[in-house]
Curated annotation (Swiss-Prot):
Binding-site residues, RNA: K180, K190, R195, Y260, Y350, R354
Name the UniProt record assigns to this protein: Nucleoprotein
Membrane keyword on record: no
GO CC terms: helical viral capsid; host cell cytoplasm; ribonucleoprotein complex; viral nucleocapsid
Domain-related comment: Ncore is globular and carries regions required for self-assembly and RNA-binding. Ntail is an intrinsically disordered monomeric domain in the C-terminus.
Family in the record: Belongs to the paramyxoviruses nucleocapsid family.
Other facts: Most abundant protein in the virion. Since the viral RNA genome consists of 15,383 bases,there are 2564 molecules per encapsidated genome.
Function: Forms the helical nucleocapsid (NC) in a ratio of 1 N per 6 ribonucleotides, protecting the genome from nucleases. The NC has a helical structure with either 13.07 N per turn, approximately 20 nm in diameter, with a hollow central cavity approximately 5 nm in diameter. The encapsidated genomic RNA serves as template for transcription and replication; encapsidation by N is coupled to RNA synthesis. Forms the encapsidation complex with the phosphoprotein protein P. Before encapsidation, the newly synthesized free N protein, so-called N0, is chaperoned by P.
Coiled-coil stretches noted in the UniProt entry, renumbered to this chain: none
Gene that produces this protein: N
Region Interaction with the phosphoprotein, residue ranges: 462-471
Amino acid sequence: MAGLLSTFDTFSSRRSESINKSGGGAVIPGQRSTVSVFVLGPSVTDDADKLFIATTFLAHSLDTDKQHSQRGGFLVSLLAMAYSSPELYLTTNGVNADVKYVIYNIEKDPKRTKTDGFIVKTRDMEYERTTEWLFGPMVNKSPLFQGQRDAADPDTLLQTYGYPACLGAIIVQVWIVLVKAITSSAGLRKGFFNRLEAFRQDGTVKGALVFTGETVEGIGSVMRSQQSLVSLMVETLVTMNTARSDLTTLEKNIQIVGNYIRDAGLASFMNTIKYGVETKMAALTLSNLRPDINKLRSLIDTYLSKGPRAPFICILKDPVHGEFAPGNYPALWSYAMGVAVVQNKAMQQYVTGRTYLDMEMFLLGQAVAKDAESKISSALEDELGVTDTAKERLRHHLANLSGGDGAYHKPTGGGAIEVALDNADIDLETEAHADQDARGWGGESGERWARQVSGGHFVTLHGAERLEEETNDEDVSDIERRIAMRLAERRQGILQPMEMKAAITVWITTKMTMPQQ
């Protein structure tokens, strides 16, 4: 029997391993698009020229008349300016199945009178039309930087702070846009400026070089459409984290920004490990959690097999990233969220109202986390030399802290119906309930079933299953009728009264105002 159980325990991991591993066969390359990237040649030495080219790249990346692939190419050109060898940077980090980068050099010819003396060329030939296209007149629909609105002079900044600091300010902001475009695209502007504040306070980004809101939105739209650009930036982070130690100040700032996108899209997976497994509470021994624990073990193996790219599997759209969704281990995730909302107040704002939430496990997690005995780690008792007296006093303090908080937290957000918990035991067979009329209200029970909260009115149902969400077309009397019907069904034997030990109240929020009784 032990061998049989062992086989079942390892099935999930072996199954994932067989799916993810290559089965051999011929490698057939896919179609790749060509993206032009411009790098500075050795003849461009003046810092003012370099900053001008950087702002030119930025302006082209915001030109809505160009294709997104071209705009992405200009952002790549801008990012490559941070390195003394842009070609090596692209060779190391730019290998991509979707695009092929074609590199053009920008040189400065003092004899040229047009295009500010710049010329686009390769080893074999010069590209006059491309030069005109790149350095010709442009009509910016909005300023690139907030300093342009304040009549600030970038040349003054260049003389004061130097070219590396000015270029670094621009590139760091591009990276911040990447972070917010991926993690919170709906609030891109607000998120960008909130994240930027720390870099403004430490002087990394000067006020005159702060992007305008239009610039932020323009760069964000390109990043959301160009996965190859996102992949290049992620590979840049991986290279800096693993292959080098002599990082420049700009690269260190990029690493700081990059930390915000580590494990992006994996919050549920990480929180399940943190609150569901690492707390090491006795509830993990439940048999109905065992399949999810095996699944989580398999996912951990998959995560570790990805090496330094593991924190970015969602950003890189790795085919396995969907396996990490909490719907694949709902019971364990629900239990972990129950523990989390008790142990960490910030987690009470986390969206737990998912359709796959296991309410029983969610309540169990809260109950276990509230239990003073469960809060004491027996594994550390001997290591720390904790005496029995100290443990007893600790239990006493924990009981005092949590003694007045008997309420359970309800799931928040999401598309699921919000559920609140009530500790009171309710006897459905009392005479008052038996005499309820078709409206479902009876004497004192009316106060129990409906209440006014924060100026809004909620109709509540004790011990109910999921109800259809009410709309503006449903009137209050119809809602009450539905409640009465459900209560009548339960009195007929669907739920026995003595089994109603944990009262579950489903709050159906109505958008209309309930008439006052």
